Amino acid sequence: MSIGLLCCVAFSLLWAGPVNAGVTQTPKFHILKTGQSMTLQCAQDMNHGYLSWYRQDPGMGLRRIHYSVAAGITDKGEVPDGYNVSRSNTEDFPLRLESAAPSQTSVYFCASSY
């Protein structure tokens, strides 16, 4: 199999320590082959209503993927294609990548606010 056929999507995530973290993302780093799926976890312990997932591509600013204003309410951001989210409670806001593509190689951020 040639190296050209084996495309990988690399995910690099900011990660805060477990003590007084505020927002925690896991896993910290992840590499996927094209077509693989995975879930990025985002947990916050500040009882914030607003949670957002962003991606930052090389040389670009942040672009919002999906966001939520409260548990059970989610909406699409600027670049939602290829991603799904859910929010069943205030604390958790996982981002699901259904089928990795090289164009999704990026740094991913989860953020919370009031």
From Swiss-Prot:
Disulfide bonds join C42-C110. Glycans are attached at N84. Keywords: Adaptive immunity, Cell membrane, Disulfide bond, Glycoprotein, Immunity, Immunoglobulin domain, Membrane, Receptor, Signal, T cell receptor. SUPFAM superfamilies: Immunoglobulin. Residues 1-21 form the signal peptide. The keyword Glycoprotein applies. It is found in: Cell membrane. GO terms for cellular component: plasma membrane; T cell receptor complex. It comes from the Eukaryota. V region of the variable domain of T cell receptor (TR) beta chain that participates in the antigen recognition. Alpha-beta T cell receptors are antigen specific receptors which are essential to the immune response and are present on the cell surface of T lymphocytes. Recognize peptide-major histocompatibility (MH) (pMH) complexes that are displayed by antigen presenting cells (APC), a prerequisite for efficient T cell adaptive immunity against pathogens. This is T cell receptor beta variable 6-9.
